[in-house]
Amino acid sequence: MEYVLEVKNSPRHLLKQFTVCDVPLYDICDYNVSRDRCQELGCCFYEGVCYKKAVPIYIHVFSALIVIIAGAFVITIIYRVIQESRKEKAIPVDVALPQKSSEKAELASSSSKLGLKPASPGPPSAGPSMKSDEDKDDVTGTITEAEETED
């Protein structure tokens, strides 16, 4: 009796733990050995021939599905991160950052010493009246004079 070997790749290392003695078995483990010797080699004895254990097709399909789903998940996450970064770039940087509570307290205490109104929590353009450039200069000059007299 002549045996024709089919060339098949050995199972991947990750799938080797799923090898079983199910038909069809392709790779011959050893010729002219007993059933006991075949089992010692870790092979399957089927119809008088000692075959290497094989990974069933359904295990290959299942592992391929897992890889495809994991890949789709990773691609989705990457796509969302890219979209978020594009949205952040599209938003103008004109929005003022909120001040910390300690900074607000310092501003309020320094303005109360000088007799100024505390700063409003909103953006500068949200105030009811806008000061002209001359008023801003006057305030700056007043603060400088007050600091000189305290020293």
Swiss-Prot record:
Task: Give the UniProt keywords, A-Z.
Answer: Membrane, Transmembrane, Transmembrane helix
Query: Secretion signal: which residues?
Result: none
Query: Where are the bilayer-spanning segments?
Result: 57-77
Q: Which residues lie on this side of the membrane: Extracellular?
A: 1-56
Major localization listed first in the record, in broad terms: membrane
- Where is composition skewed (Low complexity) in this entry? 107-119
Supply the InterPro entries for this chain.
Answer: TEX29 (IPR031685)
Residues on Cytoplasmic side: 78-151
Q: Which GO terms describe its cellular component?
A: membrane
Name this polypeptide is given: Testis-expressed protein 29
Gene that produces this protein:
TEX29
